[in-house]
Amino acid sequence: TSRTPLIFRDDKYRLAELCLKSFRESLGSLKVKLYALLDNCPQEYEHLLTRHFDDDSLELIRLDGVGNPATLMKQIEILLGQNSSDLVYFAEDDYFYLPNQFREMVEFARSRDDVHFVSPYDHPDYYTRRLHQYPSRVVTFGSRHWRTTGVTNMTFLTKKQVLMEAHRVFKTYTRRNRGILIWLSLTKHKALNPIYAFPYLMHERRTFKKLARSWLSCWRHILFGRRWNLWVPMPSIATHMEKTALAPCVDWIGTIRAEVGPLQELMQETTGANGGRDAM
């Protein structure tokens, strides 16, 4: 969950409600099967899911506080075992989606053989951090440009066959080997080349340590495995709700205001209902 979300900072349920509603609206008329992993979640979250998805399209899976790594392993097991779709989607619960836009991501994934993974999120770090200063391939499709990138978060679309081939890399996910390190390995980001990695040792020690952990955890794939392509849309189809990491070129404040009402009114409502706590 976002550390400092744009809205509902102290109310995870309302944040989840807002994001889930936007996800459902972004799907539009797409027929989906949603496997909801509830890891030690209160029962009210089950009611939230059943309000937005009918019984035929929803399967609730209750877990007893197993944590993120085990939850990811369960997701992989479920999605590789299902036969409903050739495309599978990993969704974190703190993303806000634009309405009726998810279909474009699905169509893009099916339009090209070189589309292996697709994130809905055009991360602002792509434009500011040294780690992302590298050439990208850019294509047009639908109403957007799409570019290749080296890393993303753990919300992404892929083909079942691709997941089958790459799942061993995802299974290296632990509390220390987080998503960024897995993506560096899958896309074989140039920073994993020792020649490019050395400047990080001098100027960005934290990034250098991440690169080193990626090598330690996934060296076999880095050396001998396939390079996979990760694509993101420009402009974004969704944004992470961390208030300092909103996707660029979209009026997220205005869009969210249209969903929940003027933010000032929302702050007053939340403050009154929750004993003076901040809403944003």
Feature map (PLM): residue ranges:
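Short, flexible/disordered intra-domain loops and linkers
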Residues: 2-14, 169-175
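Short, acidic, metal-binding catalytic loop of nucleotide-sugar glycosyltransferases
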Residues: 13-31
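Short loop->beta transition adjacent to catalytic acidic/histidine clusters or analogous donor-positioning motifs
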Residues: 26-35, 58, 86
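Acidic ATP/Mg2+-coordinating residue in the GHKL
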Residues: 39
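Active-site-proximal specificity loops/subdomain of glycosyltransferases
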Residues: 42-86
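Short beta-strand-to-loop acidic/aromatic patch adjacent to the donor-nucleotide binding site
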Residues: 85-96
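Conserved catalytic core of nucleotide-sugar-dependent glycosyltransferases
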Residues: 96-171
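C-terminal catalytic/acceptor-binding lobe
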Residues: 167-280
